[in-house]
């Protein structure tokens, strides 16, 4: 790892992922190289089935590459056991998905505080931090509402707060506005960009929305298993 790579929040080199089913082998990703700097906001676009979600899973340590390296906050994932990888994810990364994945039996406050509780924070400190973030995303009147009592946009705002509650170095977002109408999609995306600037948390966002992607610092296209940087249409 060189000095430039040491400064990166997250980077990968020569990343590949192959899936095998019997005699059939499909190489979804090949020779993927990517580096994410502190405070940077990067969008990844590409056709359905191009491997965008697979790439995020590898970058987040949720899957293991067929070859190549992934480094998060200066640590090589290949050298960590499952417990260590889980701790690193909890400390250094936040995740936002197309489906909010909030626990239905928990309130917005409890869902948002959960990553801090898993990390060992006291209930009082976890809830204090969760309240502050929920207020920032506009949910100060929804602390005690469960996901079923929230609108789609409110659920995704709670998911954004949950992803940021541990002060991660980087947030990985997989189609975070994919289930929202245009108005809510633009509001949630703007919220994410605002928090990127305010908190200094790097963002890697997979999206099909070219209009939203164009608002980020850098747009990469996943094509034929490789990441390329091309002008937007």
Swiss-Prot record:
Part of the ABC transporter complex LolCDE involved in the translocation of mature outer membrane-directed lipoproteins, from the inner membrane to the periplasmic chaperone, LolA. Responsible for the formation of the LolA-lipoprotein complex in an ATP-dependent manner. The keyword Nuclease does not apply. PROSITE patterns: ABC_TRANSPORTER_1, ABC_TRANSPORTER_2, LOLD. The lineage of its organism: Bacteria, Pseudomonadati, Pseudomonadota, Gammaproteobacteria, Chromatiales. Its EC number is 7.6.2.-. It is found in: Cell inner membrane. Residues 10-232 form the ABC transporter domain. GO terms for cellular component: plasma membrane. ATP binds at residues 46-53. Belongs to the ABC transporter superfamily. Lipoprotein translocase (TC 3.A.1.125) family. Keywords: ATP-binding, Cell inner membrane, Cell membrane, Membrane, Nucleotide-binding, Translocase, Transport. The gene is lolD. This is Lipoprotein-releasing system ATP-binding protein LolD. NCBIfam families: LolD_lipo_ex.
